[in-house]
């Protein structure tokens, strides 16, 4: 069975940024406006604009980048992608029709002293490789969305005096974006108050997330067992895989939710065994093709709290129980989840506190009216114009 199943701030501008903006976005002319337009139309040949997108490592960086890349392509842009060989971005990006530009660079966190000592040489080599890509492509704009590959690419963009736009998806900034934000032409964030002088626009996402019916329309007239969607992400979530089947087994079969459980390809067989051992039926899938529709169809989503997941749930307006990944850098998944939880738009359960019996009791006490209230509050926090705003900035800077 197959499941059917984000304070606005002025853009970053210092004195030098204003000067750059004047050069890039056009200064006052002594010619009448119509004369300038006529001369431009006749003297400038049509030129295909080029963007270089930089994002890698995890889906949380890559999927917002793909949303931007697809929107730029729809506007006639040629889009190239800077990434690393053998990475998730190399698997996901080329099949979508974008040219992949590989450079050799990876993270150093948690990889030992030897890797850390080799960092200066590796970084210098990656910057040279990225600079060669920028020189060859001569992009009109360079867009960084995080991941280690963004840092050498961002340095190369600024050395070549190309406009550099950054987008930070998480509520706690990553190292590459934190360092590059001082050099960037524009800085955007998915959550408020993340970086100085940044514009809070939300997270770039596909239109499907912003076009779902409002919660009160979706849930009107629903009866019967609750519909529970468990989302483990592309790599799966072992804690959810272990605990959810046990929790469901505590619930009498006639009161048990209808469950769709997504886990990564590498964990799907172990997940099947967990459900079989618990004697619980569920729809199990390694991947959800239409996540927006899945969120809309569910009464409740049980999930991690990656930036994309949190902002997409807000965009759809869905009730969710967030179980942050406890080993996320700077515990950013907890602060991501708190964005919705603090306004009553969901629940936050730390993984250390998640038990089968506790989850079973929580699920048994949930009523659709309460879930509707949570979904409505989550939707009040959505910011859905990030893709539009960043693409518009690209087009202004490319003139």
Curated annotation (Swiss-Prot):
Pathway it belongs to? Cell wall biogenesis; peptidoglycan biosynthesis
Q: Which UniProt keywords apply?
A: Cell cycle, Cell division, Cell inner membrane, Cell membrane, Cell shape, Cell wall biogenesis/degradation, Glycosyltransferase, Membrane, Peptidoglycan synthesis, Transferase
GO cellular component, alphabetical, reads:
plasma membrane
Recorded catalytic reaction(s): these are: di-trans,octa-cis-undecaprenyl diphospho-N-acetyl-alpha-D-muramoyl-L-alanyl-D-glutamyl-meso-2,6-diaminopimeloyl-D-alanyl-D-alanine + UDP-N-acetyl-alpha-D-glucosamine = di-trans,octa-cis-undecaprenyl diphospho-[N-acetyl-alpha-D-glucosaminyl-(1->4)]-N-acetyl-alpha-D-muramoyl-L-alanyl-D-glutamyl-meso-2,6-diaminopimeloyl-D-alanyl-D-alanine + UDP + H(+)
Biased composition range(s): Basic residues: 1-21
Amino-acid positions noted as binding UDP-N-acetyl-alpha-D-glucosamine in the UniProt annotation, renumbered to this chain: 58-60, 170, 206, 234, 288, 333
- Pfam families registered for this protein in UniProt: Glyco_tran_28_C (PF04101), Glyco_transf_28 (PF03033)
Q: What is its EC number?
A: 2.4.1.227
The residue stretches assigned to a coiled coil in this entry are none
State where the protein is found.
Cell inner membrane
Q: Which InterPro entries match?
A: GlcNAc_MurG (IPR006009), Glyco_trans_28_C (IPR007235), GlycoTrans_28_N (IPR004276)
Q: Which domain of life is it from?
A: Bacteria
Q: Which GO terms describe its biological process?
A: carbohydrate metabolic process; cell division; cell wall organization; lipid glycosylation; peptidoglycan biosynthetic process; regulation of cell shape
Q: Where is this region: Disordered?
A: 1-30
Name the Gene Ontology molecular function terms of this record.
UDP-N-acetyl-D-glucosamine:N-acetylmuramoyl-L-alanyl-D-glutamyl-meso-2,6-diaminopimelyl-D-alanyl-D-alanine-diphosphoundecaprenol 4-beta-N-acetylglucosaminlytransferase activity; undecaprenyldiphospho-muramoylpentapeptide beta-N-acetylglucosaminyltransferase activity
Record's bilayer topology term: Peripheral membrane protein
Give the record's family classification: Belongs to the glycosyltransferase 28 family. MurG subfamily.
* Role description: Cell wall formation. Catalyzes the transfer of a GlcNAc subunit on undecaprenyl-pyrophosphoryl-MurNAc-pentapeptide (lipid intermediate I) to form undecaprenyl-pyrophosphoryl-MurNAc-(pentapeptide)GlcNAc (lipid intermediate II).
Protein name (record): UDP-N-acetylglucosamine--N-acetylmuramyl-(pentapeptide) pyrophosphoryl-undecaprenol N-acetylglucosamine transferase
Q: Which organism encodes this protein?
A: Acidovorax ebreus (strain TPSY) (Diaphorobacter sp. (strain TPSY))
What gene does this protein come from? Answer: murG
